[in-house]
Design a protein with these regions (language model features):
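Short N-terminal edge-element motif at the start of the domain
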Residues: 1-24, 47
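A short, structured beta-strand/loop element
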Residues: 26-48, 114-118
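Short, low-complexity cationic-aromatic patches
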Residues: 28-33, 58-59, 107-109, 131-138
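Intrinsic, low-complexity N-terminal interaction/targeting segments
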Residues: 37, 80-117
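A cross-kingdom feature marking solvent-exposed beta-strand/loop segments within repeated
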Residues: 43-58, 123-134
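Compact, well-ordered interaction domains used in eukaryotic information-processing assemblies
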Residues: 45-49, 56-78
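Short glycine-rich, low-complexity/disordered patches
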Residues: 74-94, 154-171
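Mixed-charge, glycine-accented linear interaction segment located at domain edges/termini
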Residues: 120-180
Length: 180
């Protein structure tokens, strides 16, 4: 999956990062690492040209992605509300605070149903800010895409792993045998 939105001053790319699975000692498939939805923001360097070498990346967890998708739903009043996510990849370690990222969504003030996505990153004192307006149609497409991807990043629709998980768990009535 690769969905992109291109505007005059910035671009947004949406990508699926699948979860990874492994087989435990009893032959059950378990999720090793949850997937996510990767948002990549690039500033413009000219007409229809974007500097992807200076891109900012923000990986939405399944819970963050679900919240964002629900806030994107134009039939709900929640689109008028702001939503903001903050990540510090070094949190709890010696590099805490050296890289921080935030993603903020807020409704366009003109009431058209569009939103602004604002990405901010501070990396060793250097700042990157990329703002992208997302039209009503793009909001609708983004909402549908994210809602479709959330179960997949949680591992529910990976056919190989689910087949393996379901077949290994059928011999046991314990729901914990699914490994999720």
């Amino acid at each position: 999956v690769d969905f992109s939105i291109y505007k005059s001053k910035s671009a947004l790319s949406v990508k699926l990062v699948k979860p990874t699975f492994e087989t435990d000692s009893q032959g059950r498939t378990i999720m090793k690492r949850s997937g996510g939805i990767l948002l990549e923001f690039a500033p413009s360097i000219g007409t229809r040209k974007y500097d992807w070498t200076r891109k900012g990346s923000f990986m939405l967890s399944p819970i963050e992605a679900a919240e964002l998708a629900n806030r994107l739903n134009p039939s709900r009043q929640s689109i008028a509300q702001k939503v903001e996510f903050f990540h510090d990849p070094g949190m709890g370690g010696s590099s805490q605070g050296s890289v921080t990222k935030s993603l903020k969504m807020e409704a366009m003030p003109d009431g058209t149903g569009g939103v602004f996505l604002n990405y901010s990153q501070t990396k060793f004192g250097e700042k990157l800010n990329v703002n992208i307006p997302v039209s009503f149609g793009e909001v609708s497409a983004l909402e549908l895409l994210i809602k479709h991807l959330v179960p997949r990043v949680m591992g529910f629709f990976d056919e190989d792993s689910m087949t393996s998980s379901l077949s290994s768990s059928s011999s046991s009535s314990n729901s914990a045998s699914y490994g999720y």
